[in-house]
Structures are given as C-alpha cells and as structure tokens.
Amino acid sequence: MIYMDTSALTKLLISEPETTELRTWLTAQSGQGEDAATSTLGRVESMRVVARYGQPGQTERARYLLDGLDILPLTEPVIGLAETIGPATLRSLDAIHLAAAAQIKRELTAFVTYDHRLLSGCREVGFVTASPGAVR
C-alpha cells in the first residue's frame, strides 16, 4: 500500500515539474499490485487545492482520482498519535498525515511526499519514502 500526502496528490491534479515522473512511478507500482491511499485530510486538502488553483473540470477529475484511493479515517486514536508522532518540527497537518499512514504501517510500502519536513518525519518513524522526480 502506498500512502500519498497532499503534496503528492496535488501533482496528479495540477501539472508540476514532478508530475510525469510521479505518474510513471505510480503506474509501475500499480502494475505490481500496489494500491494507494490517503487520509480524509488528504481528500479535503486536495479538493481545496483544486478549488483554489484548478481549471474548469478539475473538480470532477479530483473526485475521480480520490474515488480510486483508499481513504483512511481520522479517528480519535489517529489524532492522539498525531499529537506525539515524529519530530517536534513537524507541522500539525503533516503529523496527521504521518499518523494516518501509521494505521497501515504493516502494509505500507512507500509514503509519497514532496514535503521536506514530512520526509524527515517519515524517516524518523521508519517509513520508506518516495518523491519521484524530486531533486534532492
């Protein structure tokens, strides 16, 4: 299972320099039987990004993309974990993404993000990360 935060989902909804490589990488992962997920937070943030920056018709495209993902709920235990997970420099919404991914830790093969703080948090908790197309 691949977890995608909002920085990754945005690249699938709005063309950015990493979009092509991310799509290619996801296609390869899908060919190996990998499913993808985000959290309820990722769903909300993605729809807000499209509302703010998207072109006509992108709302429907975003809904189609999100319908193809497993949407992980933000339960009380997830929110509780978000209060303490990762380094102190991790921002609140990033901590929620990290805690949401922890729900699927056993199945998690990669956490896809382009956020440097979140990458650091992922590594601190032992998640494998991917940022296809990113220059590091």
Swiss-Prot record:
The UniProt record gives the binding positions of Mg(2+) as 5, 94
What cofactors does this protein use?
Answer: Mg(2+)
Q: Where is the PINc domain?
A: 2-104
Question: Which Pfam families does the protein's record reference?
Answer: PIN
Q: What is its EC number?
A: 3.1.-.-
Q: Name one GO molecular function term.
A: magnesium ion binding
List the keywords (alphabetical): Hydrolase, Magnesium, Metal-binding, Nuclease, Toxin-antitoxin system
Q: Which CDD domains match?
A: PIN_MT3492-like
- Main EC class the enzyme belongs to: hydrolase
List GO BP terms, alphabetically: negative regulation of growth; negative regulation of translation
- Function text: Toxic component of a type II toxin-antitoxin (TA) system. An RNase. Upon expression in M.smegmatis inhibits translation and colony formation. Its toxic effect on colony formation is neutralized by coexpression with cognate antitoxin VapB47; the effect on translation has not been tested but is probably neutralized also.
Belongs to which family?
Belongs to the PINc/VapC protein family.
User: Which named protein is this?
Assistant: Ribonuclease VapC47
Q: Which organism is it from?
A: Mycobacterium tuberculosis (strain ATCC 25618 / H37Rv)
